[in-house]
């Protein structure tokens, strides 16, 4: 009998992100998305050695990587980049030409894969909470065929019947180009939009489908071959823990409150920034 592999949810999510990467792709990542970056680097270190990384930090393109950090994150992208562009050139020129794959973290997402990163609340002038903003999301999601999403904390706050605002275009009748969101990974399972509606394709270890539905604000479709998410391999875990992210920066995206603050302090102390 094979022993059960011990892993954390952030490690599983990073591995699932890595497994969505195809060798030769250009991978885009926004600001403060270490879970995605860990997955991208893991893909290059395993099955996709020929990927390139495009970062919102400095609008740079690079082929090499450094271990994840907080105080040192700019060094990862600015120090390894082979070129830098301005933001407008990155959105209007680089993104359409290179057909980048990108994982976005939505504040809200609906059954069709439309998503909101503007604000919570219908009143834009006085929202309940102002979100990070759209960046290039409204542009990219109207034409790209490689839009992917990730949600570190699956809840009915994020998965809603109706968005407060729309910043990312999903499987909408208004779409004239692109195919809409292809895939979503959360801390509960993996999903696709094979029929234009969000569909559960796998559930993580220890999670049942009733719990996933209860934490989703609309009715989910279920894939005929729905199954448990395959676990990380020992080598994938070793790479994440020892080489790619020994400081556990990726875990910041799964935590909140005191736990997140404490981990942030640990990371900054380890980097010598405090």
Place the predicted regions along the sequence by residue:
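N-terminal active-site beta-alpha-beta segment that forms phosphate/nucleotide-binding
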Residues: 2-80
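Residue-level detector of alpha-helical recognition elements and their boundaries
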Residues: 32, 54, 128, 227-228, ...
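Short, intrinsically disordered/low-complexity patches at protein termini
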Residues: 51-52, 140, 244-247
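Short, surface-exposed, charge-dense and proline/glycine-enriched linear segments
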Residues: 57-64, 82-87, 135-138, 252-269
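Conserved phosphate- and dinucleotide-binding cores of soluble alpha/beta proteins
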Residues: 67-232
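A conserved C-terminal secondary-structure "cap"
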Residues: 224-274
